[in-house]
Amino acid sequence: MPDIPVYMVVNLSITAPDSYRIYEKGFFGFLKQYGGEFITYDDNPLTLEGEAPRAGRMIIFRFPSEQAALDWYADEEYQALSENRRAGTRLEFLTLVHGLPPRN
């Protein structure tokens, strides 16, 4: 069975912009290293039904497989960089959403 892409959905509020900026500058290199692709972010998402997302930024990016996403997240250098995100944001969630397998 081929790998199925996964999507990372993140909701956070930036509380210390300088710390978050350090994280942001290093983030894209790690994302690329693991085959990840930045999809989008939105500081004002529109909720059509249900409770609105928590305050802050919604971010979506993609990995080619669950294993690639888990390897990215477990990378020791990435985790060291993530200390800047932790110091500079209030994280509501960081969630993996599985994509659909290819259709024949």
Protein language model regions, located:
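Short S/T/G/P-rich N-terminal loop/turn motif that feeds into the first structured element of a domain
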Residues: 1-74, 98-104
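A short linear hydrophobic-aromatic micro-motif
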Residues: 37, 81-82, 93-96
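C-terminal structural segments of small proteins and small subunits
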Residues: 70, 77-88
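C-terminal end-helix/capping segment
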Residues: 86-104
